[in-house]
Curated annotation (Swiss-Prot):
Keywords: Cytoplasm, Endonuclease, Hydrolase, Magnesium, Metal-binding, Nuclease. This is Ribonuclease H. InterPro entries: RNase_H, RNaseH-like_sf, RNaseH_domain, RNaseH_sf, RNaseHI. Its EC number is 3.1.26.4. Mg(2+) 2 binds at D16, D140. It comes from Gluconobacter oxydans (strain 621H). The gene is rnhA. It comes from the Bacteria. Mg(2+) 1 binds at D16, E54, D76. Monomer. Belongs to the RNase H family. PROSITE patterns: RNASE_H_1.
Length: 150
């Protein structure tokens, strides 16, 4: 996923994660597309939650980028999109406590995503799951494979 030096590559990323049951065995999948090249990523965890898998997919996808990029990241997880675009600044200000004063759930993964996102310019887009978005369906299948291949 690289381009000639000088210009930041534009990368489209789709991510998904899930569990069956939730909590339980889970999987995540990601698709990275840059200049017509595609890279699929997937993995799983024997005991997790759907939210952890959604966050893991985003972290893994961003960590796979080898240089600063202009990224459009598509997710069907409102939890991921809202956390990264609306909630995290308050969490950081409150030393990783939510508005109720409790520790933020999945703090380790939120911190991992924020660190991986630093070198990039990212537009976080929400897509409705199972609504015909071909690449969203594709990463859903990757996440299922990640869970099944545990």
């Amino acid at each position: 996923m690289s381009e000639a030096s000088g210009e930041r590559p534009r990368v489209e990323i789709w991510t998904d994660g899930g569990c069956k049951p939730n909590p339980g065995p889970g999987g995540w999948g990601a698709l990275l597309v840059c200049r017509g090249q595609e890279k699929e990523l997937l993995g799983g965890d024997p005991e997790t939650t759907n939210n952890r898998m959604e966050l893991t997919a985003a972290a893994e996808a961003l960590e796979a980028l080898k240089r600063p990029c202009i990224v459009t990241l598509h997710t069907d997880s409102e939890y991921l999109r809202n956390g990264i675009t609306r909630w995290h600044t308050g969490w950081v200000r409150r030393k990783w406590r939510n508005a109720a004063g409790d520790p933020v759930a999945n703090m380790d993964l939120w911190q991992r995503i924020l660190e991986a996102a630093k070198p990039h310019e990212i537009d976080w887009l929400w897509v409705k799951g199972h609504s015909g978005d071909e690449n969203n369906e594709r990463v859903d299948q990757l996440a299922t494979r990640g869970r099944e291949e545990l």
